[in-house]
Amino acid sequence: ALSMMLIPGSLVFLFGRMLKTKLQIHPHAIMIFVAMFVMFIGFLVTCLYFEFAGNPVLHHLGIAGGNMEGKETRFGIGLSALFTTITTAFTTGTVNNMHDSLTPLGGMVPMVLMMLNAVFGGEGVGLMNMLIYVMLTVFICSLMIGKTPSYLGMKIEGKEMKLIALSFLVHPLLILVFSALAFIVPGASDALTNPQFHGVSQVLYEFTSSSANNGSGFEGLGDNTVFWNISTGIVMLLARYIPIVLQILIVSSLVNKKTYQQHTQDVPINNLFFSSVLIIFIILLSGLTFLPDLMLGPIGEQLLLHA
C-alpha cells in the first residue's frame, strides 16, 4: 500500500521544490498536500464506517457483523477498505477484494475518488488535475472579492479559463456520455447483472475507472463484449491525452505572461484557509457534476437497503 502512495504523494513536494529558488518546499505545495490528505482520510473513514456497519438487510435477519462478502479473511474488513481507498485514490488498479461486493456507500468511495481523479491521483496526472481545481478556486475567489485572478504571479485571463474549463469537463463528459450510451445502445445493457440501482453503479464505475485509467471494476458486469471493450478503450484514450494537451496549452499560455510579485491583495494560497476553500470547491464542483448519477446508483441503493 505504501509503495502505491510514494510517487504520487512525493510529486506534490517536487512541485513545491520547483517553485522555490533555494532547496526549500514552497508553502503553497504543502497546502495542496494538506487538502489532498484531508480528503483522502475523509474518504478512508467513510469506506471503513460503511464496511464495518455491514448490510442492513442482514441485520434485520438477525445476522450481525460487518461486510465480509468478497474479502479474504487474512485481510479482513479494515485492510480491504484501506487498500480499496488507496488503489483508487492513487489510481493503481490493483485490488485485494471484490469492489462489486462492497456496501453501496462503501463502493461509492472508490468511485468518487476516481471521479475526482485529483486526490493524489496517478503519477503526475493527479497533481495536474488538482492544479486545475486550484486555478478554478483562485479564479472564483478572486472574482468574489473583486480582484484580478492571478496564480503564482501570473494573471488568469479569458483564454486560460476557457482551457481550464475544457480540461475540467473532459473527465465527467466521458464518464456520463458513455454511461448513457451503455443504456441506449441495443444489447449493451445485457451485461448488467443487477437491474436496479446497482446496475447503474456498475456502469458508472466501469467508465469512471476507464476515464481515470485505474483498471479496477465492479466485476459483476459482463463487460467482455464488443461494445464494452471498444467503448472503454476509447474512453481510456481520450481521457488520457485530451486533458494533458489542454493542460500543456494552459502552461504555455501562462509562462508567456509577464509575472509580477504577489502582494497582500491577491488571494492567499499559502495558508490553511486556502486548503479549506479548495476542499469546499472540489466538493461543490464535483457534487454538481456527479451527484444526480450517484443518486441513481450507490445512494439510491443504500436507501433501498433501509426501506
UniProtKB/Swiss-Prot annotation:
Residues in coiled coil: none
Cited InterPro entries: KdpA (IPR004623)
Transmembrane segments: 30-50, 75-95, 102-122, 125-145, 164-184, 234-254, 272-292
Keywords of this entry: Cell membrane, Ion transport, Membrane, Potassium, Potassium transport, Transmembrane, Transmembrane helix, Transport
Cystines in this chain: none
Cellular compartment(s): Cell membrane
Membrane topology: Multi-pass membrane protein
GO cellular component: plasma membrane
Recorded GO MF terms: P-type potassium transmembrane transporter activity
Subunit structure: The system is composed of three essential subunits: KdpA, KdpB and KdpC.
Functional description taken from the UniProt entry: Part of the high-affinity ATP-driven potassium transport (or Kdp) system, which catalyzes the hydrolysis of ATP coupled with the electrogenic transport of potassium into the cytoplasm. This subunit binds the extracellular potassium ions and delivers the ions to the membrane domain of KdpB through an intramembrane tunnel.
Family, as annotated: Belongs to the KdpA family.
Name of the featured protein: Potassium-transporting ATPase potassium-binding subunit
Organism expressing this protein natively: Staphylococcus aureus
Name of the gene: kdpA
